[in-house]
C-alpha cells in the first residue's frame, strides 16, 4: 500500500480528487507507516519511489530521530545520504528548507547537509541558480563556504568584480543584458523581465543553455513566439516524458510527424528495456484511454502518457506483443482520452489470445458496466486458469486518496502503482507482494536485499 502511494502520488490534483485530499491522505499514510513500521519506512528510500515521497521520508526520519535506536539511526543516515545523491538539487534544497522550518538542527542533520553541499560539483553555480536555498542551508547548518561563494550569497554588492566566471556574469547581468545569456535559464528569466527583454529574443538567446527538462516545458512557449532554437532532443528524452510531449501535440501534427515520433518512442523503449528486450514472451496489454486518462489541469494527460509509454516499452520487452486500447483503434500515437472505462470486454479480448503475460494499465475505475473486469478476472483465475499459466499485473498510475492506495481491479490480481513506464519491469518484481501470496517476512527479506544493493551501488560511485 505505502509503496504504491509513494510511487504514484505527488500530492497534486487528480481527475477524481483534489490536491488537498491527496496531501491529507499522503501525510496520514506517511505518519502511520513511520510510527508502526519504521524500518520498512526507511527502506523505501532504496525503492523507486517518486521525488516528493523520497523527500518526505528523509524529512520525517530526521524529524523523529529521537524515536530510533542507535543502529536504526546509523542505517537511516546511510540511506538518507545515498538517496539525497540521487535527487535533483532543487528537491534536496527543499528538504533543507523544511528542516529549517521545523527547527531540526541536530549534529546529525548538520552533517548530512554539510556532506551533501560539500559534494556539489560547482558551489558557485549553486550560489547563482539556487541562491536563496543555499543561503538557507548555509545559515541553518553553519556551513563554511568556499572562495567567493559566501560573499556572493551574503554581501554580493561589495565586490567590484568576481574572479569566478559565473559569479561575475551574474553580477554584470544586473546592468548588462548580454551577460544574462551566460546564466542558467531560471536565473536569466527573472533578469530578462527586469530588463524588459522581448520573450522571443530571450528564448533565442538562452536556448543553448537550456536543460532537457526546460526544453520540454518551453515547447509551447517556443511555438507561440516562433522560436526554432528550443527544439527538444527526441533522441535522448526519457520514454514517459517523450510520450507526454507527443500527446501535447495536436493530432494533425502527430500525424505529420508520425515516423519521427514513433521512431523516438521505440528507441526510448529499447533503452529502457535494456537486456530484457524480447525476453517476456507473448504479451498482451489492455490500455486505458477513457476520459479519466486526461488527468487533471495539474497533471494533464499523465495517465494516458503512462499508458502510451507502457505500450512501447512492452513492445520492446515482448517477443510477441498486442496492445488493446479501450476505445482507440489504429496507430497508438493518435490516441486521445474519451468515453467510459469499460475494462471487462477488453480483458476478455486479451485473454482469448492466450498470452504469457497480461498487463493492464488503468486507474482502476471500471464503470462500463461497473465490476465487470473484477468478475472476468475472478472467473479466469478460479476456473479457467487456476494454475496461473498467464501472469496478470495491473499497473495503476493514479493514487486513490480515499483508500490510501491505488485502486485495485480484483482480489488475487497484483496491482502496483506506476509513475514512469520505464519502471514497469522492476515493478512487476514487486507485484507478488501486492496479492498477499508473499508473506511479511519475505517482504522484509526482499527490502533488505534492495537496501544493500542500493547502498552498495551509491557508495561505490560517491
Tell where the protein language model's regions lie, with residue ranges.
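Long lumenal/extracellular ectodomains of secretory and single-pass membrane proteins
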Residues: 1-285, 292-296, 324-462
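…and closely analogous acidic/polar surface helices at protein-protein or active-site interfaces
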Residues: 280-281, 293-321
Amino acid at each position: 500500500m505505502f509503496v504504491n502511494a509513494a510511487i504514484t502520488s505527488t500530492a497534486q490534483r487528480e481527475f477524481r480528487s483534489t490536491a488537498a485530499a491527496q496531501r491529507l491522505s499522503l501525510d496520514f499514510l506517511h505518519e502511520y507507516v513511520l510510527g508502526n513500521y519504521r524500518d520498512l519506512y526507511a527502506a523505501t528510500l532504496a525503492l523507486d519511489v517518486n521525488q516528493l515521497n523520497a523527500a518526505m521520508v528523509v524529512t520525517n526520519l530526521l524529524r523523529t530521530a529521537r524515536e530510533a535506536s542507535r543502529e536504526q539511526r546509523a542505517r537511516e543516515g546511510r540511506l538518507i545520504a545515498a538517496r539525497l545523491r540521487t535527487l535533483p538539487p532543487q528537491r534536496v534544497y527543499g528538504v533543507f528548507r523544511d528542516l529549517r522550518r521545523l527547527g531540526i538542527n541536530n549534529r546529525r542533520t548538520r552533517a548530512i547537509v554539510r556532506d551533501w553541499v560539500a559534494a556539489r560539483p560547482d558551489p558557485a553555480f549553486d550560489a547563482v541558480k539556487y541562491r536563496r536555498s543555499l543561503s538557507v542551508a548555509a545559515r541553518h547548518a553553519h556551513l563554511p563556504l568556499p572562495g567567493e561563494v559566501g560573499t556572493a550569497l551574503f554581501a554580493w554588492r561589495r565586490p567590484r568584480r568576481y574572479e569566478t566566471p559565473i559569479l561575475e556574469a551574474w553580477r554584470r547581468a544586473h546592468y548588462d543584458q548580454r551577460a544574462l545569456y551566460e546564466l542558467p535559464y531560471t536565473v536569466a528569466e527573472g533578469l530578462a523581465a527586469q530588463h524588459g527583454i522581448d520573450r522571443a529574443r530571450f528564448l533565442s538567446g538562452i536556448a543553448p543553455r537550456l536543460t532537457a527538462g526546460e526544453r520540454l516545458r518551453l515547447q509551447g512557449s517556443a511555438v507561440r513566439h516562433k522560436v526554432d532554437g528550443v527544439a527538444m532532443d527526441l533522441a535522448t528524452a526519457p520514454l514517459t516524458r517523450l510520450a507526454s510531449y507527443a500527446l501535447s501535440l495536436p493530432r494533425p501534427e502527430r500525424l505529420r510527424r508520425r515516423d519521427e515520433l514513433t521512431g523516438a518512442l521505440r528507441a526510448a523503449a529499447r533503452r529502457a528495456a535494456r537486456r530484457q528486450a524480447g525476453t517476456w514472451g507473448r504479451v498482451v496489454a489492455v490500455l486505458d484511454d477513457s476520459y479519466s486518462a486526461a488527468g487533471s489541469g495539474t497533471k494533464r494527460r499523465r495517465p494516458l502518457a503512462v499508458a502510451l509509454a507502457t505500450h512501447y516499452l512492452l513492445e520492446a520487452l515482448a517477443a510477441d506483443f498486442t496492445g488493446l486500447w479501450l476505445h482507440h483503434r489504429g496507430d497508438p500515437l493518435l490516441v486521445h482520452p474519451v468515453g467510459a472505462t469499460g475494462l471487462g470486454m477488453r480483458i476478455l479480448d486479451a485473454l482469448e489470445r492466450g498470452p504469457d503475460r497480461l498487463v493492464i494499465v488503468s486507474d482502476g475505475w471500471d464503470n462500463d458496466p461497473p465490476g465487470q473486469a473484477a468478475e472476468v478476472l475472478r472467473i479466469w483465475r478460479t476456473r479457467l486458469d487456476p494454475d496461473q499459466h498467464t501472469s496478470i499485473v495491473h499497473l495503476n498510475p493514479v493514487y486513490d486518496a480515499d483508500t490510501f492506495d491505488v485502486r485495485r481491479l480484483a482480489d488475487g490480481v497484483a496491482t502496483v502503482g506506476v509513475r514512469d513506464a520505464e519502471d514497469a519491469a522492476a515493478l512487476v518484481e514487486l507485484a507478488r507482494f501486492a496479492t498477499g501470496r508473499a508473506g511479511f517476512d519475505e517482504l522484509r527479506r526482499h527490502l533488505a536485499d534492495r537496501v544493500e544493493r542500493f547502498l552498495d551501488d551509491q557508495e561505490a560511485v560517491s
